[in-house]
Amino acid sequence: AREERLLVAAVDDKLQPGEYIVTNPKTEQQYKVVYRGANSQWNYCSCFDFRTSQLGTCKHIEALKLTFGGRRKVHRELPSYSSVYIDYRQGRQVRIRIGCDNSEAFKMLANDYFDEHLALKPAAYAHFHEFLAKARELDAGFRCYPDALQYVVERRENTERAAWVDALGQEDFDSLLHTRLYPYQVEGIKFALKAGKSIIADEMGLGKTIQAIATAQMLRRKALVGNVLIVCPTSLKYQWKREIERFTGETVHVIEGDLLARCKQYEGQEPYRIISYNALSNDLKLLKSIEVDMLVIDEVQRLKNWNTHIAKAARKVNALYAVVLSGTPLENRLEELYSVSELVDQFALSPYYKFKDRYIMLDERGATAGYRNLNELGERIKCFLIRRRKRDVNLQMPERQDKLLFVPMTKQQMVQHDEARWHVSVLLKKWQTMHFLSETDRN
């Protein structure tokens, strides 16, 4: 907070006391901060670090502490209205704060939906809309903060989507693509559909690409997805295009051209659009963020260092659904696993300091010496990561087919071939005549 010299401005000391806008002058990013005192449980910031660190503070809240420094009055008083919010100190918990306005009626209402710790009951997520309607009848000033409502909606959608996937039959998958899907591929597609945002880390050769395409097609069939953005290495752009066209018959657009031309192409109507990592990174310097229905990231191991420009760019693509593909075993380096997991669920393994302390062993120099508690970690990631090896699904795979393709040589290759053939013929003749080859000949 001291180093970045953040700018602090009050929203409205009379109408919204204790609420501030904190601006980072370098990035021009603005954050909403609620400050009720140095160690108040009611402090809040809209930044990513506050939501995931579980510390109850961040550099923007610390900037408020520096700004006040005992010289200005801190608005410690809480609003009179009741509100539903997310407590980020132990993961994410939806809670209610009961204000002084009509407090007894709100306490009675809360008993039906919240537990003794004022946390939303698991069974109440499905009926949260009923609670909101009753709460607004009690007090027009009642608030449900956007992040809390979004989380409730997310939980409900996950439940509804899981029920839909469980009801899918084999005929739904048989008609999905212009090819037959193997049982393990259907399993991977169902996994990705249920998760919403997932990592498919199958061994190379098991058809991760086709699983991602089939997942997108099933979501499009359900009208949950309208457009899909595929991010991949430059060398794979047209391979993705051919595969999508071959298996779906849908229109595919490869985003190319100069910076301004590419930025316009994100608004196209094609169901599938493809962009390279480097182009996306450059485009987001101008666009700041991109909104898509579904995101597919191929060769995600290239994003293992989350401080690179490309990795940061991938995190600025906002998508309702995502499938991340990796052909390398992420469990070999837990630091990379943590980085990739942030692309599908920023809260799954965070905060990093707790993750590192729990699962990574360091030597006296601070370097990684080994890992621990891996069974526990496996349980944590199995809701969003699936990995199969060829030996695991060997019985489901077709028999190996070998095809010989004869390709004519180019002129340059023919010249090199003829030179090599001449040298070989000389050596053969010498051997047939003398039955001896010198060391120079043998090399």
Task: Please provide the spans of the model-predicted regions.
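Hydrophobic, aromatic-enriched, well-ordered structural segments
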Residues: 1-42, 67
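Charged, low-complexity
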Residues: 12-14, 72-198, 224, 242, ...
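Short Cys/His-based metal-binding microdomains
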Residues: 28-79
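P-loop (Walker A) phosphate-binding loop of NTP-binding proteins
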Residues: 192, 203, 328
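Conserved SF1/SF2 helicase motif Ia
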Residues: 199-206, 211-242, 321
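Conserved P-loop NTPase motor "coupling/switch" region that bridges the ATPase
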Residues: 221-227, 242, 246-249, 268-269, ...
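Conserved helicase motor
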Residues: 254-262, 277-282, 302-308
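Inter-lobe connector of SF1/SF2 helicase motors
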Residues: 364, 390-443
